[in-house]
Amino acid sequence: MYTYQDFLKAGSIRDGIRSAIARHRVSEEYKTALDADLYDRQMNTTINNYVQVIQDYSGNPVVNANAANSKIASNFFYRLNTQLNSYLFGNGVTFAENDEIKERLGQDFDTALAEWGYYARIHGVAYGYWAVDKLHVFKLTEFAPLLDEFTGELKAGIRFWSLDWGRKPQNIIFYEEDGYTAYQLDPDNDADLVEIHPKRGYKEIVNTTPADGEVIVGEDNWNGIPIIPMYGSRLKQSTLIGTKEAIDSYDLIQSGFANDLRDCAQIYWIIQNCGGMSREDLQEFLARIRLDHVATADTKGMGVESSSLQPYTQEIPFQARSAYLEQIRHQIYESFGALDTSTISAASQTATEIKAAYQNLDQEADALEYQAIKAIQALLALLGMEGTPVFNRARIINEAEQVQVVMMEADYLDDQTVLELLPNIPVDKIDEILERRKLQNGNLFENDQEQPENGFENPFESENE
């Protein structure tokens, strides 16, 4: 690992930047992140790079160009990571009894947070850059961190990108605690880094006048570097690790089954005592059978063995492969801590059974939520604020059972709480419903009609009570 202390030992800032990028691009974490991006796009490397090899007469391996080469890549990696990310971040984040924090973070914070958490999972770590009023996400494949050897904290960082690495110009931004500097490197002229603009502060002081419009009159910085790491779990590693082999096994077996169906003739013919027929004669004979579905054979030989024609069918093993594929699929979901929705039918499962099915997913979500809370609180500390992030997880429920439970408790709850607990009531409709109920209740009281204490009739209450 190339640390901040290693960077300081470089001959110059430009040499340190180039060394840091070069070391980062050959690290195992970077290579794993690149693989994770490919699996995330269903471009699974193992099955896509697979070729069938046979041995020639000399025993040397050669590519079998005549064999079927179907490459069926599964989409497990994207689906499982998306499931966890949507489960935890799908409803955004709120802050207990402090709406000012959410307003300060901006209306795009929830979507940026979901992206931040997703890349933290598939890469092992992702970095959030706070640009005055908006959060930007830096992936591990485009950001080289410079960590302090003694504290492990981020002291500086280098973001790098190019439309075509090695052919198009490389754009580089060097982030330090007291500002950032932009560089560019032309691959056709492998000279020193060219400074595009000198170091600038992270916060610009702008003065607006009718004559000149907005004019930058000064700069300022935060108390530290405004880049916060979020780790995918306490292991600080990609979710591809430990999952890749199971996905590859599933892909190879599934693709191999398709290739066997193409390579193996399901019906073939054995023609006996017709050795004098040439290849062309055999092909013509087979064509006549396919066309006429009739063949003649001399079964009464004159002192010689008679000829015969016998069809054979071939069946590809199916049951064993299907059972093994199902076993691997179950293992992938179990090891990943995901929810297999095929095992849940909300119409037939009780709330307790559904809750039990979410156990593994809840544990994985807890691990990611802990890391997300740490990252968000570090961001709030940078902004001089304090707050506790709260996540409302989205899960499958038995709506009929939950409605029944809520209505049984309605006598002890106020109107707004009842509406918030009902699963079939949209959140944005609650205020509108409460307002209409106030008008309705007012009309009822004017007509001297009896009104329940909380405004809700309980359909589960016995008429005799």
Named regions from a protein language model:
Residues L80, G92, S306-E315, L439-Q440:
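Short glycine/proline-rich turn/loop motifs
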Residues E97, I101-D108, A112-L113, G242, ...:
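Short amphipathic alpha-helical segments
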Residues A287-K300, I316-E465:
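C-terminal helix-loop subdomains that flank or include functional centers
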Residues Q5, Y39, N64, W116, ...:
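Conserved aromatic-histidine-acidic binding/catalytic patches
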Residues T209-Q349:
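Extended, charged amphipathic alpha-helical segments
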Residues G117, I122, Y127-G232:
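Extended, regular secondary-structure scaffolds
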Residues M1-F138, F460-E465:
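Extended, helix-rich architectural segments
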